[in-house]
Amino acid sequence: MCGICGQFRFDSENVSSKSLTSMMSKLARRGPDSSGKWLEGKIGFGHQRLSIIDLSSHGNQPMVDDLLKLTLVFNGTIYNYKSLRSQLIGKGYSFSSHSDTEVIIKAYHYWGEDCVKYLDGMFAFCVWDQSNQKLFIARDRMGIKPLYYNLSNKAFTFASNSQALLTQELDKSVNPLALQQQLSLHGVVPAPNTIINGIQKVKP
């Protein structure tokens, strides 16, 4: 269980390191092994790591591939990462780690958004594609790994839990429809709703 967060700003402001730190503090229990931040102007990622597959520092995140101009934060486990890694090596890609994180970066570069069709596992991740100035965010098909977001006219902000997003400026009022669902559906609020108006869940 790791924790991821990030922000992409649309206004004249750059992403604040303090803002990322605030979100990461609410994710710390999800990833006690290491933490990392990456900021580049209007985009920034934070990560709290629980080491599972590649225990070395080569698996630390946010993971930046300068050659492919991709940056990734990822929470989860890709069960078929070894076979995907072999497949991508056969297509000319090289790897500097043994992590499933790096496999996602290469898979995204090769297959684009369709990379999720090849991933067998539980995951939530976000990729910044510098070349195309595009942010891509995804969850596993069953929605095992959580991912929440806030979208305003100033920024798109995401995190592994709602507590992290509550450190940001957003509408913190209660969503009455979600409250009704919470009380009547055995505590389940279907995506994209959450109990907070300013926070949504990424659909699986």
Predicted regions and their residues:
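Cysteine-centered catalytic environments shared across enzyme families
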Residues: M1-P204
